[in-house]
Amino acid sequence: MSYSRSMYSSSSVVGGSPYRSLSSAPRFAPGSSAASVHAGPGGSGARISVSRVSSVGSGFGGGFSGGFSGVSNVSLMGGAQNEKETMQDLNDRLASYLERVRSLETANKELEVQIRQHTEKKGPAKDWSPYYKAIEDLKKQVFDSTVDNSQLVLQIDNARLAADDFRVKYEAELAIRMSVETDIGGLRKLIDDTNISRLNLENEIESLKEELIFLKKNHQDDVNELQAQIARSAVTVEVDAPKSQDLGKIMAELRAQYDGLAQKNREDVEKWYQSKVEEHTMQVNIDTQELQTSKNSVTELRRTMQSLEIELESLRNQKASLEGTLHDTEARYAMELEMLGGTAMARESELVQVRSDCQRQQQEYQALLNTKMKLEAEIHTYRRLLEGDSFDLQDAVPTVTTQTVKKVITTTQRIVDGKVVAESNDTEVLKA
């Protein structure tokens, strides 16, 4: 943000020299040889009497302090006067003129010496082009720093967006992990139920085995008892009856029948036990495979989560580092910008001062030059008087000119965040 402020000042220049003038000696144009000159103190209030001129008026100035002032009336009256007195008066007046010319020449030499000393003291104008180059380089550095800051801000925004994406992925993976852990809990409960069922079946198998052993033992006892009874019975009865059945054969048949029944029951029990064992073994294998798969998934998810946490932590550290770097860079460039602004303001102030000094020196030089020209004109006029040449009274009267000079001072200030970081003053002289 910048704005300009202008201040105007004006000054009047009389005779091309502001506030300073040197008075010149009175200059006259005698009309004929029969003339008388009467001079007042300082060259003002002079009277010249000429027989053929009716009246002439002119203004003269005296001293080195003010403008041309002290206007006197010159009356030329006709009449015959004594030639000797006239020549005496003219010689006296001419002597005073010569003395005045010598004093003016001395003053002119002193002014030339002062001008030469002032010029040598000031020296040549300072070359500001190296500062312009340095200012351009600093502006380029500020621009490059601004671009670097923009890139850093963009990188920070990208890192923030990437961190947000990783956070979303982490939350999604965490939800999947929780669901998998829930499934694992259900599978563990199912495994526990399966183990309990397996233990119950094993207990049933053991009880069936014990029952089978008990049945075999009872059967063997019954067979032994029947065989003992058959052996103890030794009675032979001979009757006329049909041929009796063979008890041994019957017992063998019964034994074979019971053996077949027991074998069949054993086979049925073994088949049922084998089928149950195979079924539960298959279920256990399936559950074991699912559990292993779930464990692998959980391990992979845990590994992924750890890698994501590590990457998230690294991104957070990188973000903190970039933010610290950005803060330091902003502080450093703000300090450098403030220093550059102060340097630029100082250079602009020096430039304004140099311009003002140049203008003042130019005005002083112009005033001295005008004074020198006036003195040379007066000396030339005195020489013409000494040589006896005639001249118009209008040539002897100095031309008083008034010139108005208007100065326009433009102050430009650059404001950043409410602070003035740069200020420049530009002075322009307008001659009316």
From Swiss-Prot:
Pfam families for the chain: Filament
Chain segments carrying region Coil 2: 251-388
Residue span, IF rod domain: 83-393
Cellular component, GO annotation: cytoskeleton; keratin filament
Stretch list, region Tail: 389-432
Segments of this protein annotated with the region Linker 12: 227-250
Site (Stutter): 333
Name of this chain's protein: Keratin, type I cytoskeletal 18-B
Species for this entry: Xenopus laevis (African clawed frog)
Gene assigned in the entry: krt18-b
